[in-house]
Amino acid sequence: MLITVYCVRRDLSEVTFSLQVSPDFELRNFKVLCEAESRVPVEEIQIIHMERLLIEDHCSLGSYGLKDGDIVVLLQKDNVGPRAPGRAPNQPRVDFSGIAVPGTSSSRPQHPGQQQQRTPAAQRSQGLASGEKVAGLQGLGSPALIRSMLLSNPHDLSLLKERNPPLAEALLSGSLETFSQVLMEQQREKALREQERLRLYTADPLDREAQAKIEEEIRQQNIEENMNIAIEEAPESFGQVTMLYINCKVNGHPLKAFVDSGAQMTIMSQACAERCNIMRLVDRRWAGVAKGVGTQRIIGRVHLAQIQIEGDFLQCSFSILEDQPMDMLLGLDMLRRHQCSIDLKKNVLVIGTTGTQTYFLPEGELPLCSRMVSGQDESSDKEITHSVMDSGRKEH
């Protein structure tokens, strides 16, 4: 029969594997096979099936009610006692001996026990920076140490701001007490989620509610993994792009027009039409409602006007909107009429009927309503610098 094992190690790392065994296979031998797959020592393995802990090692799996296709949970016990010297199977091979811990000298020789105690703290710092919430309250390193390690590493600090904003905000507040409170609260939440997840995995496989929750958890894990991969492989997808604007003139008045090939018609705001002195030409029989992301009331239509782009004077019609933040939008009707093409490689709008090219405006020249939110990044950088300097003064 095929048994699927869902393994949760002491450090809350997970692994899933399947074992082909017979119903008369003893539990102790099953644990030996699990040790080879999970790298968890036999004496630290706990097997749970249907919310029941399997205790008698000499009993067969069939006597416990296991059958083909069943799922069991493997939990690693806490430290069961002193182990022989040497590397534990799941001990990380990363050497953190070269890390200078705040308050100590990196040149001073370290006792092996001290080095092993520092390693989890360094791992927690890396986990926090990658957006991961620390898993359990037991084995928590000093919040002051974690805070100092994050403040001393700009890369980890930037990752923390992206993936764990509440903790980053507490870190940059300059208050160790606030940072400790947020850290402990996130740990409690993570511990509760882990308990709920273990309860679901050990529940009755035929329980529809439990299966629905497991399905939702798997979906959320896939979403989180997809986002993390995108952050690593395509970080530019999380940035904002500058919209396409060009300089033009209507009735001699300079304007900044938004080029939108997805808009059906060319529109102009009522305020802009009044500045350009073309409100007298508005045909109110064409009043209506423009629908898109929202709705806007159309006052009417200017059937024919001239728009100047560079040295070209082009015929154009405008639908006048009552309450529109941008002055003018060049829609597909105007772009098609004059065979315009958007060349993003050269960053120009090409007028097909005349061959004239006009450059798209940089962000600094865009109307205020279309500029990206600025100033936040600069203030955040100042906060980081202030926190690092403040932390350095406190340590010295």
Swiss-Prot record:
UniProt xrefs under PROSITE patterns: UBIQUITIN_2
Compositionally biased tracts (Basic and acidic residues): 379-396
Organism name: Homo sapiens (Human)
Start and end residues of each Ubiquitin-like domain: 1-81
Gene Ontology MF, one: aspartic-type endopeptidase activity
Residue ranges with Polar residues bias: 103-128
Activity regulation text: Inhibited by the proteinase inhibitors amprenavir, indinavir, lopinavir, isovaleryl pepstatin, ritonavir and saquinavir.
Entry's Gene Ontology BP terms: cellular response to hydroxyurea; proteasomal protein catabolic process; regulation of DNA stability; regulation of protein stability
Membrane-spanning intervals of the chain: none
Keywords: Aspartyl protease, Hydrolase, Protease
Protein name: Protein DDI1 homolog 1
UniProt keyword Calcium, yes or no: no
Start and end residues of each stretch annotated as Disordered: 82-130, 374-396
Active site: D260
Summary of the function given for this chain in its UniProt record: Probable aspartic protease. Seems to act as a proteasomal shuttle which links the proteasome and replication fork proteins like RTF2. Required, with DDI2, for cellular survival following replication stress. Together or redudantly with DDI2, removes RTF2 from stalled forks to allow cell cycle progression after replication stress and maintains genome integrity.
Family under the similarity heading: Belongs to the DDI1 family.
EC number: 3.4.23.-
Pfam families hit by this protein: Asp_protease, Ddi2_HDD, ubiquitin
